[in-house]
Curated annotation (Swiss-Prot):
InterPro entries: UPF0114 (IPR005134), UPF0114_bac (IPR020761). It is a multi-pass membrane protein. It comes from Pseudomonas entomophila (strain L48). It is found in: Cell membrane. This is UPF0114 protein PSEEN0819.
Length: 162
């Protein structure tokens, strides 16, 4: 009975595979939105104010960071919890493939969230005259919460490894 239960629990890790595949569909949706933004801004690039162009570029950077985060979570999550990826060595292989455990993934996700939050905060500050002081304060508080959380996670990870 114990062996059956253990085998069933071990096999249940495959339930994560469609979730990781779903993230790839999210990546596709993000790519479509990215190119929609590019197509929307290109005809107006010569008439846009510099600040508005910077806001669009920050939005594109934000989307690329989210896309990178999706790829990282998808691939390393699959490798850590479902099955090892069998990529032919003759093909291009990501340098971190097979080397990122759940702890390092957690730190990379935290760093990515801080970077994404920083870009969003910069975008908010560029439009600060149209945003109330209370909202600005909450944006900063939320961003600092992400920053402090990332530092605490890094510190805890460091002291548990030693």
């Amino acid at each position: 009975m114990e062996r059956i239960l253990e085998n069933a629990m071990y096999a249940s890790r495959w339930l994560l595979a469609p979730i990781y595949f779903g993230l790839s569909l999210g990546l596709l949706a993000l790519a479509l939105k990215f190119f929609q933004e590019i197509i929307h801004v290109l005809p107006n690039v010569f008439t846009l104010a510099e600040a508005d162009l910077v806001l669009v570029i920050l939005s594109l950077i934000d989307m690329s960071l989210v896309g990178g985060l999706l790829v990282m979570v998808m691939i390393s999550g699959y490798e850590n919890f479902v099955s090892q990826l069998d990529i032919d060595d003759s093909k291009e292989k990501l340098s971190w493939l097979g080397k990122m455990d759940s702890s390092s993934l957690k730190m990379k996700v935290a760093a990515s969230i801080v970077a994404i939050s920083s870009i969003h905060l910069l975008r908010v500050f560029m439009d600060a005259q149209n945003i109330s002081t209370d909202y600005l304060m909450w944006y900063v508080i939320i961003h600092m919460t992400f920053v402090v959380s990332a530092f605490v996670m890094g510190y805890l990870d460091r002291i548990t490894k030693h």
